[in-house]
């Protein structure tokens, strides 16, 4: 018997507020779609937008491209929604995101990249994590793509995007998801031996040559003491 999706409360987010802009400015995201039979160049832009949304720019590699899916989309054999589904369920996406994160963080990444919003709370992370554990990765992805929320905002022919990241009432927009949620979480960075202090210290302590202490300066003695303390 499968466990049903646990209930979770919603929280205040920009994407839950209707927009009444008469003519949205250039800061609003462009919605890439295949409704109007795009040309070859326009289709290239649509495909690039899909890769950028799902893999994020720092994960777009030659190994993540899927020429078979691209060909099916170009010849109208599948819709954007199916193309997104294929990218998320690909072996490349699994290796780059699922295998290097726990279920909670993977849920956060998928909600951001598929639904175009941040998770509402920890309860939502838990609810979707239970789905992954009980029904598997494919069922989790299908539930997101087949949800009413996805259908209302993107349908079958629009590439997902971060919804209402910038609103006119605020001087600054929300942080883009690719910066807010990098590939690795803090726990996996420690596991892989990549603590940030290894490289941040020398960068922050850099001094131009003319500002470096001369022989006999007390600062040199203090630096020597600090170096010795690190090896205790």
UniProtKB/Swiss-Prot annotation:
Q: Where in the cell is it found?
A: Plastid, Chloroplast; Plastid, Chloroplast thylakoid membrane
Q: Name one GO biological process term.
A: photosynthesis
What membrane topology is given?
Peripheral membrane protein
What Gene3D superfamilies does its record include?
Phycobilisome linker domain
* Entries under InterPro entries matching the protein: PBS_linker_dom, PBS_linker_sf, Phycobilisome
Residue ranges constituting the PBS-linker domain according to the UniProt record = 11-191
Q: Which GO terms describe its cellular component?
A: chloroplast thylakoid membrane; phycobilisome
Alphabetically ordered keywords of this record: Antenna complex, Chloroplast, Membrane, Photosynthesis, Phycobilisome, Plastid, Thylakoid
Biological function: Rod-core linker protein required for attachment of phycocyanin to allophycocyanin in cores of phycobilisomes. Linker polypeptides determine the state of aggregation and the location of the disk-shaped phycobiliprotein units within the phycobilisome and modulate their spectroscopic properties in order to mediate a directed and optimal energy transfer.
PANTHER family under this entry? Answer: PHYCOBILISOME 32.1 KDA LINKER POLYPEPTIDE, PHYCOCYANIN-ASSOCIATED, ROD 2-RELATED
This chain belongs to which protein, by name?
A: Phycobilisome rod-core linker polypeptide cpcG
Origin organism lineage: Eukaryota, Rhodophyta, Bangiophyceae, Bangiales, Bangiaceae
User: Which gene is transcribed and translated to give this protein?
Assistant: cpcG
């Amino acid at each position: 018997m499968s466990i049903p999706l646990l209930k979770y409360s919603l929280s205040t987010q920009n994407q839950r507020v209707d927009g009444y802009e008469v003519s949205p400015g250039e800061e609003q995201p462009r919605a890439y779609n295949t409704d109007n039979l795009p040309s070859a160049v326009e289709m290239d832009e649509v495909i690039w937008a899909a890769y950028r949304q799902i893999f994020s720019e720092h994960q777009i590699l030659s190994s993540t491209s899927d020429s078979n899916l691209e060909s099916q989309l170009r010849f109208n054999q599948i819709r954007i929604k199916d193309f997104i589904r294929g990218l998320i369920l690909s072996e490349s996406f699994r290796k780059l995101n699922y295998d290097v994160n726990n279920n909670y963080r993977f849920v956060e990444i998928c909600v951001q990249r598929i639904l175009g919003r941040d998770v509402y709370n920890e309860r939502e992370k838990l609810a979707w994590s239970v789905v992954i554990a009980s029904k598997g990765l494919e069922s989790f992805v299908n539930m997101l793509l087949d949800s009413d929320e996805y259908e209302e905002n993107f349908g079958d022919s629009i590439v997902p995007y971060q919804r209402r990241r910038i609103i006119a009432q605020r001087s600054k927009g929300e942080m883009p998801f690719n910066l807010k949620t990098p590939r690795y979480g803090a726990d996996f960075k420690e596991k892989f031996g990549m603590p940030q202090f290894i490289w941040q210290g020398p960068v922050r302590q850099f001094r131009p040559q003319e500002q470096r202490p001369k022989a006999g300066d007390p600062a040199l003695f203090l630096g020597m003491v600090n170096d010795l303390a690190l090896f205790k």
